[in-house]
Amino acid sequence: MSSHAYEHKPLGGRVLTLPFLICAALVAIAGVILFQRYTQGLAAASNLNDGYPWGIWVAIDVVIGSAFGCAGYVIALLCYILNRGEYHPLVRPAVLASLFGYGLAGLAVLVDLGRYWNFYHMLLPWYAQPNSVMLEVGLCVATYTLVLVVEFAPAFLERFGIEGLRAKLNKVLWVFIALGVLLPTMHQSSLGTMMVVVGHKLSPLWQSQMLPVFFLLTAILMGFAIVVWESVMASLNFRRPMETPVLSKLSGLMLAVASLFVVLRFADLIVRGQIGQIFGGPQSGWFLAEMALMIAGLVLLIPKANRNRSRALFLSASLLLVAGILYRLNVYLIGFTPAVGPWHYFPSVKEIMVTVGVFALEIALYLVFVKKLPVMHAVHPEHG
């Protein structure tokens, strides 16, 4: 494949559109709440308590938000590691989505930390616990965010005509691409390992030695789903041709990963002797909802004709994305009982608004970047 076969161009157009202004308003509301959180403490802006070490700011903004950021991971794996050049038009939009997903997930951690001013301690060897899986996740996420900045840098350099530096960067970019595949593989699986450690505090419907595998599979699946979702939405909102031919090929991989996940999930329950929990346990409804969404999404992709229809692709990607979201939410929050006693947790309106604001900021920045920087491939690329 040749990376020069596709030309990228800014989409142009007004930035101050209605969607952007709505997102900006949501970000402003979240900003006011965050000011209250940092001046008055966690209790002023959340329902977190001594019985629950984290809430939706970790479960959604970080654990789920980082999976949204796996679009760049899966496309880099396909395009550069497996040398599937047909996916190259999807690279820059996917890397941009990853940059925002991981960058904002990293910042969201600082919102949840009680002593956020000590966050840099993980970088100091005399404070670090080398056997901690949480340390590995933190270092990997921070490093991968920097890697994504470097991977997206060619778009900035191209936009401002800094061709000399861009040419030099291209010579060493393969190192960062390799890191961009290695690091998410490490920390996405380690997000599962973190919950293996909690033992009986996690419902037997989800507690398993296979958690690292399941988290890696959902990261890959959600990465594919985000690529499809983002591509279809961009085509609709920016009046661009649908990228159905390349998305059709991607959908076959989504089908394979989703099918593997479902088979392994049920096999794991059978091997552990917990299959009866799916109808009788206290959280069985959440498990059934998670699996129903996953199975519905993959069944929709089985007919080959559906893989060539943008509506079916979008619906399937949406179902699989929500299934991945629910699986991670089940593991990190719904199926997790961290303390014995009269402790309960349900997110406050302020917590929810902060989370909404984080995703609104991601959308607003995406709108600015695709309009001002060469992110999207030209509708009629030149071949040479």
Regions inferred by a protein language model and the residue ranges of each:
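N-terminal signal-anchor module of multipass membrane proteins
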Residues: 1-71, 75, 363
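Flexible loop linkers connecting adjacent transmembrane helices
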Residues: 2-6, 78-95, 117-127, 376-380
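Long, contiguous internal "core" modules enriched in hydrophobic/ aromatic residues
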Residues: 6-15, 20-30, 86, 124-306, ...
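Hydrophobic alpha-helical membrane-insertion segments
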Residues: 21-30, 98-106, 315-324
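Alpha-helical transmembrane segments of multi-pass membrane proteins
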Residues: 23-43, 107-111, 182-192, 366, ...
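Membrane helical hairpin/interfacial module
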Residues: 52-117
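Aromatic-anchored segments of alpha-helical transmembrane domains
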Residues: 103-104, 184-186, 261-264, 320-329
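TerminUS-proximal long segments
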Residues: 308-384
